Amino acid sequence: MRLGTIARIIKDTYYKGSLKTTYWAASHFMAEVRALWAPGRDAFRGEVGRGLWRFATDAVMPIRGENEQRARAAVDWILRGQSSSPDGGVALGYFPCDDGGAGSGWRVSYPETTGYIITSLLAYAKSGGDTAVADAAMRMAHWEVDVQMPTGAVQGGPVCPPERQTAAAFNTGMVLDGWCSAYVHSGEPRILEAARRAADWLVDDLDEQGYYKTNGAFVSRGEIKTYTCLCAWAIYRFGEISGEERYKQAAIRSIEAALRQQQANGWFAHNCLTRSDAPLTHTIGYTLQGVLEVGLAAGRSDFVDAVRRTLDALLPNMQASGYLPGRFYADWEPAGLSSCLTGSAQLAIVCYRLAGHLGEARYADAADKLVDYLKALQSLRSEDPGCVGAIAGSFPILGAYMRSGYPNWATKYFLDALMLQQARLRT
C-alpha cells in the first residue's frame, strides 16, 4: 500500500470526526485490549497475538484443498452458536472481550443473519445428506417465524423484546431468503405464510424510485442504503415460489434503483452501513450479489455487466496472496488498513457465480485466491472452542470491522464460498 494511501486512511479514520467521537472510539478499543488480560482469556489472547504477528510479517500462507474439512468445521461452529442461545436462533457471534455481559463470549441471537444462515445450512445438508444440519436449519426458520413482527417485517439488531423492536428492510430481506429456502425444503404452510408477509412488507416499503424506506435504527440515517438491494434477490425468489409476477417486478425495480448509484468506474454511492465515502467490501458484496442474482434469474444482461464493471475495478487491489483491503474510496484506493473477511468471502461468491455464467476463468481464479487466503485464517485447533472453525470479522482480528471477535455472517459466507469452490473442483 502506498504511503500516500496510508496517510489518507489515517487522516480520515482518526482526524475527520469530532474529538469526542475519536475519544470514545479509542476508549472502547482500549477496553477491549484490556479485556484480553482478564481471567480465562489466555487462549483467545494467544489467537489474537498469533494473528497480529502473521499480519505484521505477512506470514499468511494460502491453503489449497481441505474444503470438506473446513466446511464441516464452519458448520459445527455455527451450530455451536445456535446451541449457545436458548431460542433456536444463532448467536450474533463469539466476542470474548465484549459479549454484552453474557459471560460465555457468545452474544444473543441475531434474526437477520440467522435468516440467511438457514439457506447455507440447507445447501450444505443437501450436498451431504446431513439431516441433523437440516433439522437445525429448520429450528432456525421456526424461531424466525416466532419473532416476526406483526407487520410482517423483521426487527433490526440482536433479538429483543417486542416493545423494543424496530423494523429494518435489509433484515427482513435476509430472513425472507431463509424462509424461501426452508419452504422449498419442507413445504410447510406456516413458513410460506411468514415469507409472504415479509415479501409484502418489503414491496410496500419501496418508494417511488425503487429504494427501501425503512433502514432501521442500527445504521446511519438520512440517506438511502444501496446494499439493501440484496433484498431484491429474496423477493425474486419468493416470486418464483409463489408464481406471482408482481414480486419479480418489484425486485427488478429495486435493482434498477441500485444501479443508478453506480458510478462510471463501477463504485457504488450510498453503499455502507455508516461510511458511504468508503464502503466496506462487505456491503459492496451485498450489492453485487443482489444485482448479479436478480440479473441471472431475470435474464438481465445489463445487471450482469454492472457487476463485471465493479469487479474489474476492484480485483486489481487484491494482493497475489488473496489479501484484500476492507474498504474502498470512490477512486478505488484502499480506505482501510485491515481486511474485512466477510467481504472477501462475499466477493469470492460473486466471482464464482459470474465465472460460471460467463465462462471466464479469471473470475474463478480470483475467487480461489480469496478463499484460499481465508482458509489460512480459519483455526481448526485452538484451546478456545469458540474460535475453532470460525472466520473473524477482520484480519488482523483487532482491525476495524467487528473487532475482537467472530460474527456469524463471516463464517456463513466463508461456508458458501467453500461450497462453490468445491463445486468448481468437481467439474
Q: In which residue ranges do the predicted regions lie?
A:
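Glycan-recognition and catalytic cores of secretory/periplasmic carbohydrate-active enzymes
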Residues: M1-T427
